[in-house]
């Protein structure tokens, strides 16, 4: 079970730095899963060094983290934003659902590195539980849509 209050407490502390956090998450995703970069049209075919401080990665970082933040702030009552997120990723972006698990796992690691005092063991467990819940609900949407990607 996710401790949504703990997750939101850390999220609030991080929000002022959302672009940098998002950049670090995306760069780590691309480093660990290079094939994932192909799902971001403005970011594909560029080296990590080229991407590091571009306007494109900053914009994508904001988009990704703000969408995730909108879901996190629902404290588990996130069916509407999850449905909307899944719908665009199924029909427009065609991103396989396992990438949500990958990026949220990376997010826990990046947050732990960037906010070590806030991301203690309890907070890491809370985020892992929250992200597991979110990813599970996203996967249900993919299954309902019979995603073949």
Swiss-Prot record:
InterPro entries linked to this entry: Globin, Globin-like_sf, Myoglobin
**What broad class describes the main subcellular location of this protein?**
cytoplasm
| Reactions accelerated catalytically | Fe(III)-heme b-[protein] + nitric oxide + H2O = Fe(II)-heme b-[protein] + nitrite + 2 H(+); H2O2 + AH2 = A + 2 H2O
> Domain of life, per the record?
Eukaryota
Any one GO MF term held by the record is: oxygen binding
Modified residue annotations for N-acetylalanine: 2
Protein's GO biological process:
removal of superoxide radicals
Report domain Globin positions: 2-143
> Where does the protein end up?
Cytoplasm, Sarcoplasm
What keywords does the record list, in alphabetical order?
Acetylation, Cytoplasm, Heme, Iron, Metal-binding, Muscle protein, Oxidoreductase, Oxygen transport, Transport
Its EC number is 1.7.-.-, 1.11.1.-
Which residues of this UniProt protein bind heme b?
89
Q: Does the keyword Nucleus apply?
A: no
Question: Where does it sit, as one GO cellular component term?
Answer: extracellular exosome
Task: Tell me which Gene3D superfamilies the record gives.
Answer: 6.10.140.2100, 6.10.140.2110
Q: Which PROSITE patterns match?
A: GLOBIN (PS01033)
Q: What does this protein do?
A: Monomeric heme protein which primary function is to store oxygen and facilitate its diffusion within muscle tissues. Reversibly binds oxygen through a pentacoordinated heme iron and enables its timely and efficient release as needed during periods of heightened demand. Depending on the oxidative conditions of tissues and cells, and in addition to its ability to bind oxygen, it also has a nitrite reductase activity whereby it regulates the production of bioactive nitric oxide.
Q: How does it assemble?
A: Monomeric.
Record-stated family:
Belongs to the globin family.
This protein's name: Myoglobin
Upper classification of the source organism reads:
Eukaryota, Metazoa, Chordata, Craniata, Vertebrata
